[in-house]
């Protein structure tokens, strides 16, 4: 129980960065040469001490060819079912909690419009604060109903705040990575 509580808090604790953890999301299609080339240009700027996780054959090939520290590679089908993404996220969270790397970042191609896709790297962990995380969720899914927000009754959380925080942060990271995978496949 306290271990879960600690893992929830670990997602918010900033620690000295010895190793960045970078998830690289590439396309598998051969006709997207510039898309992957631009993404790999951004990945190439990441310092050599970083540890990488790849989603997509092209990312795996690139990271192997450039002799980067590739911890794992995953394949996510075109439909990107959440069950496939869950394996990736659970691996990343485990590596982060075991302190094999001190950040979780995602290198992906951001879809601007059909003619413009921008490669970028976003940091997911550690979280800056809970308010930022909630604001992101509200922006994506809408704010809670005002009547619910005004309810001042005290709520007893079971199993406990620590477990809920750990689950909430884990779900948030899963949802964010899932969204980035969908966006990079657009």
What is each residue range found by the language model?
Residues 1-186:
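C-terminal beta-strand-loop-alpha-helix "lid" module of Rossmann-like NAD(P)-dependent dehydrogenases
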